[in-house]
Amino acid sequence: MCLALNIYHEARNQPTLGQIAVAQVVVNRVNDSRYPNNICDVVYQGLHYESGHPIIHKCQFSWYCDGKSDKTKDEEAYQYSMKIAKNVIMGDSFGYLDGATHYHTIDVAPSWASGKKFIVRINDHIFYRWD
């Protein structure tokens, strides 16, 4: 499941609220005409070689194109990601995200962030939306 993989790789070290927020960003993108209209296409969005493999560091979510294995190693964390993904897909969402379509960790300061509206910081992630 694409959404669960994204939660696992992007936020498994975050509290539940942070994991839900990462999932909600994907769903918000699906509902935004600037992005693909399904979860897997949003998660795997980026530049790809003709072979279909992602180009290193040229995708929306860093885990997908960092050159490392995308296999899950922590089964308990992956199962929890699956649970969160299912709940978010079934419509569980939280108003505190206010349409967030972007986030990054507190360890980086991407140039795109200055053009977005800050919404909230949840643990190690900062969330934004188009302004």
Predicted feature residues:
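Bacterial extracytoplasmic/cell-wall-associated proteins, especially those involved in peptidoglycan
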Residues: M1-D131
